[in-house]
Amino acid sequence: MLELGIKAPDFELPDQDGVMHKLSDYAGKKVILYFYPKDNTPGCTKQACGFSERYPQFTEKGAVILGVSKDSVASHKRFEEKYGLAFTLLADSERKVIEAYDVWKEKKNYGKVSMGVVRTTYLIDEQGIIIKANDKVKAADDPENMLKELA
């Protein structure tokens, strides 16, 4: 996990429609940048739907939500359409941003050890500085917790 108080690494990734986004495009806004393991899985779906349901509240507070996983653009599009997600999903199939943000880690699941994305959420301020980082994310609680951070 990256340290608080540092400049968030800039990046450029395609969204669910294939449109390229840079973190620097969002200068002047707060950014909730959350990394999740996989589209259409139970925890990831809860988290995404929670952010989507609260999306108007985030925009009222001047924040944007960017969800990142190693899934493809096409997978993100299906995920967005299936659940009517109201925010941007970014495809990092080469894991460049996932690794830059230090969320590609060894994970243990039911005794099996493998490498994967550790669910992590960063709050980045209007100047691009990381002001909050959480790698102990509970998928269902993350959207509400991040909304409280903006209060």
Which residues fall in each region the model found?
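Chalcogenol-based redox active-site neighborhoods
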Residues: M1-A151
